[in-house]
Each structure stands twice: as structure tokens, then as C-alpha cells.
Amino acid sequence: MAGAALIGTPAGHLFAGIPAAPTELYALSSLLLEQWAAGLLSLQVTDSSRVDDYGGIWCPADKAVHGRSGDAIYPFFHLAAKTKNKKYTDAALLLYRWMDRRVSQPDGSWLNEPQKGSWQGTTVFSAISLAETLKNHGALMDPSFKEELRVRLKAAGDFIYNNFTIEYGNINYPISASYGLLLLGEVLDVPKFKVKGRALAHDALRFISTKDGFITGEGDPYHQPSKKGCFSVDLGYNVEESLPELTMYGLLAGDEEVLQAVTRSLRTHMEFMLPDGGWDNSWGTRNYKWTYWGSRTSDGCQTAYALLAARDPAFYKVALQNTRLLQQGTKEGLLTGGPHALSHGIPTCVHHTFSHSKALTTILDHGDSLRKPVPASLPREKSYGARFFSDIQTWLLSKGDYRATVTGYDREYKKFRNGHASGGALTMLWHPKTGPLLVASMNEYQLFEAGNMQADKDPHSMPLTPRIEWKTGGLLYMNISDLDATIEVEDSPDQLAVHTRSRLVDKDQKNPPAGEINCRVSYLFTKEKCVLSFQYDPIDAGQQEGQPGIIFPLISATGEPVEFVDDRSLKMVKAGSQLMLSADQPLVQLPTSGGRIFNFVPGLEAIPLYIRQNKAVLEIKVHSI
């Protein structure tokens, strides 16, 4: 490339960070990273006449270049070191020049999107990515570019140092700044950066809850509990960003106090990994960016769980299972937006790929910390009955092969309403032969972060969560919106029974014009089946608009054979097994645009079923064909 400021590996340079991939996790990560890089390279804009986009990575979904696409520079350099192929360094330089033109700011920050007034907090992620590049692959840069990068990183460090406090944005930002400042301080030899990085890391420890071990602070108010005593917790951001950055801080600083706190918290969050590697963030405050494999724009869980695998053998399995799932979700070199995104014809946002490529690059650069993994099980692989997490008012249920989640979590994200489900909702029903059967989405799909989410243009779109609802007077009333709902669990050797009480309320917790409508929803789990019972107060809707009903979206990808046996039962073939659904009331299939509805949260399709009566019992069984 004309004017390139990057050079090949110098004579005698030894890049010791790339391991020989002795374990499946590292072999798979290396393979997947190359696939993702190929996908990203194919989308890089090399037409210099496209001035604004030249050098950036084009997003097929958003028809634009995302402001954080420069995060791919770090993976490109890693692959340049591994393969000795100059195409990666050429692409990295071109991408850096795009960053410099389009998102770099005079105050040292980088914009989240190439738009005036865009969020600057993501500067910390760009700074970490470029500092890792300089630290691990500086030998691939010629002196002039290396010095240019050092100067630019110093400006970014000053921005972070001067602006970030423990209450800057959501908690993932100051936690990331703890590692970012320490790393910049080490790479650039700026002692004050390291001092503030340590202060932020230790201040962040008080955000790890004493009861359950969750990281709180994903939304405000930081310090004021909800009515049920809950604080703001988001599984996706915790496992894919905050805990990885605290891990990196602890390892670089040799800070055992931080590493012990992180280890405890990782064990708590590990409870929510499904056996297939999916993250059950059906309840999180920021689950508007939840995809089944993680979160749309965060980095990935591999950094924390792989690099601390020596502390708990199950950590290695967490990282491995999730990486396997990432591979399954990768098509044509890009990580798709959920298991059913492609089957529903959803274009792939490139953000998933360049963000998650950083986690794989990080563990590959650090080398395999666990050469001989000890066999271990994930918590949800075991049939343990019921576990309650009071921090989030959520139950995890495990009976036979069924895995379920029921939540009454009452902390919403900032001032937004109708985000994650509550009300005693069944937010996850999973079976090893079929994967997810019932899954919660947002109560109302809203673009809380429009630049980081995809618009839903389907006129038949709806929430995926099983629920009771009533549309009347231009408002939507649902039991899954009720933040005051109660949940009781009965755990016996033969069965698990969950009884919930809630009301039909709108997003502001108000009753419909007809008055208070009480709902009673129960879930029964045995080794053989799952039974769901719905009931709500009968009302005289004659003077009201619309009719209440029970809505039951059954997760099913386009192409899965479905047969209605009669008006009260159906059978479906999923992954070589058969699901039988039966009800004591007629089932009505609601309109769709092509046989299925799709929800970006968490990237799944479903067949929407409706029951008009105010009482219904549904039974689900799964068996091999």
C-alpha cells in the first residue's frame, strides 16, 4: 500500500503469544477468528471515491460504517503476526485512517458513531483495543506509525483520566476504564493513569453484590434499590464486558483481591449459561441488546472465563460452549444476530463480529492457560430443583431435562418502561433435545440505543414472552409488565411448581379502564413434561375496546415441520425430536408475515398462538423420534 506505515515481522521477532492451540477452545477460537477476519476484510471499503467510508468496514444491515469498526485493528494485527500476511496490516492501517478522519476528536475521544454529538464513552474500548495492538504487536509497526499511535493513545488516556469516574455512564464504563488506564499507563509509562486505574478497580468492587455476587450498576440510580430491593443488573454486559475488563486489570496488576472478587462473581453469572452455551439474559436491565449467544456490541465472555480457567474447571467449559455457539451462529464470515436471524431473512450487522473478535484475540494473545482442561459440568447441566437469586428476584428451575427461568425482577433500565419481562413471567424454557422452547423478549421492542440496534419493520411483530394481554383504549396491558407480582415455588422430589400472581397493567403500572384484573399463572415441571396454567379475572368487555387473551409464542425456526393435530394440539419436529403441545382450549394461530414472527431479542422466531378464554392449561412434552 502506498504510504503504508506498517512493516512485516522483523528478523528475530518472536511472537510468543500465539499458542499451538492444544485445547479445543483455542483451536476453535483461532479458526473462528480467521473466518471473521475474512468476513470483515470482504466488507472493507477500498474505493477511495467514497470519501466518508473509505477504509471503514461496511455494515450490510445498517448500510453504514459503524464508529467502533476500528476495534478490528487489533484482530487484524494478531493475524498478521500469526500468518505473516501483509493484507492484514494493510487493512489495519486503512481502517485506522478511517478512524482518524471520521470519529477522532480534538479532545482525545473517539465518537461511538461518525455523527456530531455521538457518545464518547466508548473511547475506552477503542483505547484498550489499540493499546493491546501496540503492546502485543508493536514490532509489526514502523517507528513513525508506532509513535503516531503512542501520541494518539496518550490523548485518549487523558480524556479517560479527566472524564471517567465510578459514576460515568453505566458501570461497564468505569470498570473498563480501570483496565484501560492501567494498560495505557504501562504501555505509555504514565504513572497517574495506573494510579487512577487501580482506584477505579477497587471502587468497582463495591458494585459486586454481597448477597448473590452480581455486578450492579447497569442503569441508574446506582445506589437506590427498587421496591423489591433490586439494583440494576445485566447479564450480557457483565459477562461480556465488565468481568472481562476486571479480569484483565487483575491479571496485569497482579491484584489478587480483585481476581478473587471476579472469580466469585463469575461463578454467579455462570449459573445463567444454558447447556448449549447460550446466555440466559431474559431478565437483564439492558437485554434490549441480548442475543442468544451474548450481547450485540460487547466483546465476549471468553476473556474472563478462559484466562481464569485454572481457578475453576467449569470456567473453561463456559468459554468453550459459548465459542461453539458463536461458530454455529457464523455464516459467510459474520456472526449473525441470533439462531434464527438468517432463516427469517434478517441482514447481519457487522458490529457483532468485530466486537466479539476482540475477546478471541485476547485469549489467543495470552496463550492457553489450561493445557489439560479438567472435565466439568455447567450448573444448568444438573437437575438441581430450584435456585433463587434475590438480587434480581429470579428463579432458575431444573427438573429432568427441562430448564426454566421465572422472574419478578422490578428494576427497569433508567427511565425506560416495558423493557425486560417481569410479572412472574416464564422467560426461558429449554430442553437439550430442542434448545429453547419458550423465551422472553422485551415487553415492547424499543430502540433504546438506535445506533446499536436494528429496526423492526414487521407489522405483525410482538413480544415472544408467554403472557396475558389486553389492548384497549390505545394502550397495552400485560401481566408481564407488573412489577409488583409475587412468585411462590414448591420444590419436591417429583415436581417443581411455580405459582405467580400479577395484574394486567400498562407500562406505567396502571390498571385498564375496566379496573383491576388479577392474573394467576402457574408452571409445573416434572421429568416428563411442563404444564402451564393461565387464568385472569373474567370481565365484561362489552363496553370496552378489544378482548383480553392468552398469547403463547412457541419458538420455532422457519422450515421446522409443524402439524396441527386438531384445534387444541400440535406437533413439531425440532432437531430430530418431536415436541407435542396440547391445550384444554382452542388454539388460534395469529397472523405472521411468513409463517413465523421474529424478535431481535434474542434473535429467535416463533409461531404465535392465542387463546380467547380466560382460563387455559397447556402441556409440553418432548421425545425422540
For every predicted segment, state its role.
Residues 256-260, 270-549, 553-572:
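Extended polysaccharide-engagement surfaces of secreted carbohydrate-active enzymes
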Residues 576-579:
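Short, low-order "capping/linker" segments at domain edges
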Residues 27-56, 90-109, 147-167, 192-219, ...:
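Long, well-ordered core segments of solenoidal/helical folds
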Residues 582-625:
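Beta-strand-rich recognition/accessory modules
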